[in-house]
Amino acid sequence: MAGGDSLCAMSADTPPARANPDDPADPQPTGGDRADETGSTEQPRETHKGPVTLRRGQVESTTTDQRLLDTRGPTDWVHADPWRVLRIQSEFVEGFGALAELGRAVSVFGSARISRDSAEYALGREVGRELVKAGYAVITGGGPGTMEAANRGACEANGVSVGLGIELPFEQGMNEWVDLGVNFRYFFARKTMFVKYAQGFIVLPGGFGTFDELFEALCLVQTRKVTSFPVVLVGTDYWGGLVDWLRSRVLAEGKIAEQDLSLFSLTDDPVEAVRIVREANETRRREVEEEATEAAAADSHRAERSGSPGAGRRRR
């Protein structure tokens, strides 16, 4: 600056000169410049975190890199929501990677609280065996009770037995009959895997967790988020009251449509449950093949009517 003046020596009436507005090294005043009681102009405190601008009281005293490299710093940042987004992403990546080559599978749900000598445990075990005989892998929540029974049946039938565990304060770890296990922190990531890698649900008697998985599947089918996804309830005595209530109260009051009650089937027979799933899958496979054939025929017909540019030139 001319005359050897400096910013510190300038009077309050003299604005700081901008030697080179295009030079990033030259500090530029902003619209947020403020004058204190002495008349000096100060820059507002401002930092950037990616697309986020922070000023004044929102400015952090340390940088992201500094906190990363300072091993003596606090560690509670790993529990902040932005970090959780990365953790959630990692759960989807791990789940997709582990299950991508699974092949045909069915998710089986039911209570974690039944004993191994109960009729429901035997029922779950038979469901697992029948699914393997029909060519399906068995996916469960990986826990005890019905989940263990279905995994055990699949394992004993020399099939693929999958467990998708969840971090809970009171649950046991992955049961011993799981051959391929993936653990999750977040329910929604885990439930995505149950639907994405299964060709249907078989639901045995269970509690709130079972109801959650059942009604999420029904909602996804009802809203066409998934198509041709068979849901089979096993245990007419257990599920009958719920089905009656859906018909006599929910349907009667117009809160669901008549066709919504056809989104699931009810049986006592594990063999029939697997047959329902298999037939629904075969029907859907034929529909997809027919749709592909019709689409190819329509494309061919349009091409014949319009003619290719090359064909037109040859005729001339």
Predicted regions and their residues:
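C-terminal functional extensions of proteins
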Residues: 15, 233-316
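Generic secondary-structure signature for well-ordered alpha-helical cores
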Residues: 94, 98, 136, 155-159, ...
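Active-site/ligand-binding-proximal alpha/beta "capping" segment
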Residues: 185-237, 281-286
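Solvent-exposed alpha-helices and their adjacent loops that cap or buttress functional pockets
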Residues: 99-101, 130-132, 154-155, 172-176, ...
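Short gly/pro/ser/thr-enriched loop/turn and capping motifs at secondary-structure boundaries
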Residues: 167-173, 210, 238-241
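Glycine-rich beta-alpha loop segments
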Residues: 11-18, 29-166, 173
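Short, positively charged and aromatic/hydrophobic N-terminal segments
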Residues: 5-9
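Acidic/glycine-enriched connector segments
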Residues: 145-203
